[in-house]
């Protein structure tokens, strides 16, 4: 049996990333992930260590995403449902259903159990704009810790209450 120190030394190491990661984004073939356990493992390790990957060759049908997600775990439902379409609606009750340009954000921080993994699956995009921008929050926190340790400490020690109110729900 490995000692506690040996197990600690062998633990997964997250990799912080910045803008240059876009050129080296870990990319996997959808069909290989679905049918080859070794590729599935490599994909899951990349998700664990980097936090963001891309699957190519994913069919553009609605039934594909739940099959992919349940290949690795169960799907946790939210007030948006099991799956939801991000689209512009006239009577939107969430920014997800508007054409607004959203700033960088974290989805569902009001939840006791935030999403462990999220998938974005583009079926059709006839609109201009709508690009997704991703940032590594841990890299931002590390830069803050290095550059302004006092502000980093305040961020770590100050409780923040998140709130989400809509016509049908109130989470905080």
Regions found by a protein language model. Give the residues of each.
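Hydrophobic, ordered structural segments
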Residues: 1-13
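Active-site environment of non-heme Fe oxygenases that use a 2-His-1-carboxylate facial triad
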Residues: 18-172
């Amino acid at each position: 049996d490995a000692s506690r120190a040996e197990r600690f030394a062998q633990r997964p190491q997250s990799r912080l990333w910045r803008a240059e990661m876009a050129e080296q984004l870990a990319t996997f073939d959808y069909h290989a992930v679905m049918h080859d356990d070794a590729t599935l493992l490599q994909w899951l390790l990349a998700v664990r260590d980097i936090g963001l990957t891309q699957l190519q060759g994913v069919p553009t049908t609605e039934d594909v995403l739940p099959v992919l997600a349940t290949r690795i775990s169960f799907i946790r439902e939210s007030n948006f449902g099991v799956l939801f379409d991000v689209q512009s609606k006239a009577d939107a009750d969430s920014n997800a259903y508007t054409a607004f340009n959203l700033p960088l954000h974290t989805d569902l921080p009001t939840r006791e159990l935030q999403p462990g993994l999220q998938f974005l699956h583009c079926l059709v995009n006839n609109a201009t704009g709508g690009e997704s921008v991703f940032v590594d929050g841990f890299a931002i926190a590390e830069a803050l810790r290095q550059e302004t340790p006092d502000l980093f400490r305040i961020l770590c020690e100050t409780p923040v209450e998140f709130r989400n109110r809509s016509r049908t729900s109130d989470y905080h």
